[in-house]
Amino acid sequence: MSEYLFTSESVSEGHPDKVADQISDSILDAILEQDPTARVAAETLTNTGLVVLAGEITTTANVDYIKIARDTIKRIGYDNADYGIDYKSCAVLVAYDKQSPDIAQGVNNANDDPLDQGAGDQGLMFGYACDETPQLLPLPIWLSHRMVERQSQLRKDGRLPWLRPDAKSQVTIQYMDGKPHKIDTVLISTQHAPDISLDQVRESVIEEIIKPTLPQELIKGDIKFLVNPTGRFVIGGPQGDCGLTGRKIIVDTYGGAAPHGGGAFSGKDPSKVDRSAAYAGRYVAKNIVAAGLASRCLVQVSYAIGVAKPTSVMVETYGTGKVSNEILTQLVLDHFDLRPKGIVKMLDLLRPIYAKTAAYGHFGRDEPEFTWEATDKAALLRAAAGL
């Protein structure tokens, strides 16, 4: 019987890197609302009292970037300079260029088939699904997301008014024979008001945030709870750490349970395969697992800049497949259009839906806008596999 520990982490919407992600995706949404064919690569930097907006944007949309940045910071809850940044008084610098014409000529010029739009860059992307949770997401990352999400809820509804926006979570699960067996360790670090004691923070976080989130069937023996291990977390947000778009790519995906191609998501329009192909990979993998064709599934897809057809597609099921990986790969090629424009059409991605993705995970969430979480091709795949 094999036994091991596996850990994943998440961060709250008030973490400085996530503040940057949400600003970038809020700007993307505002542009797509007016101009669905825009080319957007919106990067954000946050620091004490400062937001810098840079990148490449080609659009006909008329967008107030500074207002969007301030509104996003306000929505997150940074309305006091003592928290690390204040939406009312922070400086916002804007430095956008247009997309390079060298890139645009490979992305904009389609052949006879309008779906033959070239990829916006080279790269490799992964999608993953497993049967550890009803959402077909690995349990450690799913639990980590739910804990910081609950921290935000309790902060915003006033039940724990001393909570501040910045927080991190980390969950360690003991696995036996490849399946979650019990919860081993839970760590939460949360920003808080200066006048509350560490004992109060620890008791409230354990009782109000951690315990209500834990699956009862995995509580076996003592769980190690770690809350604010440094003893104090008053200085946080962009004051505690500089935040950058795209610096939480493992939090955004599978918590380290699957490989990552290295490309971030936030601030990028769907012509960027870093984002759209990763969403498509998740869609493919989730449908394979939902079809009962495997209990774990990894999909890799790769692209060349300016070329529509993927340079490779691979399916790996780690010995859990009901049919061979080669058969599954052919099923994917037969039933999913993985050209960039095909992905955009398949998942209806030219919509202002991205700000919601920028905190608490892009995957494993039951949101109506998240078309890549649908399992509408599971029955088709199962029938095509002869099961």
Swiss-Prot record:
Cofactor(s) named in the record: Mg(2+); K(+)
Cofactor note: Binds 2 divalent ions per subunit. Binds 1 potassium ion per subunit.
Residues that, per the record, bind ATP: 15, 166-168, 232-233, 241, 247-248, 264, 268
GO biological process: one-carbon metabolic process; S-adenosylmethionine biosynthetic process
Start and end residues of each stretch annotated as Flexible loop: 99-109
Cellular compartment(s): Cytoplasm
Keyword entries, A-Z: ATP-binding, Cytoplasm, Magnesium, Metal-binding, Nucleotide-binding, One-carbon metabolism, Potassium, Transferase
GO CC aspect terms: cytoplasm
Alphabetized GO MF terms: ATP binding; magnesium ion binding; methionine adenosyltransferase activity
Residues annotated to bind Mg(2+): 17
Location, primary (coarse class): cytoplasm
Binding-site list for K(+): 43
Entry-linked InterPro entries: ADOMET_SYNTHASE_CS, S-AdoMet_synt_C, S-AdoMet_synt_central, S-AdoMet_synt_N, S-AdoMet_synthetase, S-AdoMet_synthetase_sfam
The protein's annotated pathway: Amino-acid biosynthesis; S-adenosyl-L-methionine biosynthesis; S-adenosyl-L-methionine from L-methionine: step 1/1
Catalytic activity: L-methionine + ATP + H2O = S-adenosyl-L-methionine + phosphate + diphosphate
Assembly and binders: Homotetramer; dimer of dimers.
PANTHER family: S-ADENOSYLMETHIONINE SYNTHETASE (PTHR11964)
Function: Catalyzes the formation of S-adenosylmethionine (AdoMet) from methionine and ATP. The overall synthetic reaction is composed of two sequential steps, AdoMet formation and the subsequent tripolyphosphate hydrolysis which occurs prior to release of AdoMet from the enzyme.
Name of this protein: S-adenosylmethionine synthase
Organism: Methylobacillus flagellatus (strain ATCC 51484 / DSM 6875 / VKM B-1610 / KT)
